Design a protein with these regions (language model features):
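ATP-binding Walker
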Residues: 20
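Conserved substrate/cofactor phosphate-moiety recognition/catalytic segment
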Residues: 31-70
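P-loop (Walker A) phosphate-binding loop of NTP-binding proteins
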Residues: 17
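A glycine- and Lys/Arg-enriched "phosphate-lid" helix/loop adjacent to the NTP-binding pocket
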Residues: 101-146
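Glycine-rich phosphate-binding loop used to anchor ATP phosphates in small-molecule kinases
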Residues: 63-108
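NTP-dependent small-molecule kinase module
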Residues: 2-8, 28, 32, 78, ...
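Hydrophobic anchor at the beta1->P-loop junction of P-loop NTPases
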Residues: 14
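Walker A/P-loop
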Residues: 23
Length: 181
């Protein structure tokens, strides 16, 4: 399976709410499949030459979302990546469409209470720097999860270790014949 994945041009696109483990699982999945890992926000930041919060502040959300879409199209055309999307990327249908053209979308489904515990002391996410962070997380989670579920080809509950989640992802892709192998 892992050798076959390395030869494929299909992307494995990980989506889910912030704190669900997209980057952690993505890096491990990259090692297991010998596919290159791409953190979408990092990819956008590198291309723009500035951090995401600075892009939002200087150019606005619309500009960031355009860069995000360009990245989705580019990655889908090139293929062969494990992609960790930003939390908002797949709330836009044009990004869902782009990623589905070149890959398989995998939702890492993590219970809200687990996300709240993981994000409780997170100081690296500008969206969470607010006094009502738990209410905000709950409301955003309720808004985004139906969009993630609609976009996903595969839904993986994030119970167990990151390695166990990776094995579940690979098994699900194989069972659904979504590996091009």
């Amino acid at each position: 399976m892992t050798g076959a994945m390395a030869q494929t041009k299909l992307n494995i696109v990980l989506c889910g709410f912030m704190g669900c483990g997209k980057s952690t699982v993505g890096k491990k999945l990259s090692q297991m499949t010998q596919m290159e890992f791409v953190d979408m926000d990092g990819y956008i930041e590198k291309r723009a030459g500035m951090k995401s919060p600075d892009i939002f502040e200087k150019h606005g959300e619309g500009f960031f979302r355009d860069l995000e879409h360009e990245a989705a199209v580019e990655l889908s055309q090139r293929g062969g990546y494990v992609v960790a999307t930003g939390g908002g990327a797949l709330t836009f249908q044009r990004n869902v469409d782009a990623f589905k053209e070149g890959g398989v979308i995998v939702l890492l489904d993590t219970p809200l209470r687990v996300l709240q515990l993981r994000l409780k002391n997170d100081r690296n996410r500008p969206l969470l720097q607010r006094p009502d962070r738990f209410r905000f997380i709950r409301e955003l989670h309720q808004k985004r999860m139906p969009l993630y579920r609609r976009a996903a080809d595969v839904v993986i509950p994030t119970k167990g270790s990151p390695n166990a989640v990776c094995r579940q992802v690979l098994q699900a892709l194989e069972e659904k014949n979504l590996t091009n192998s």
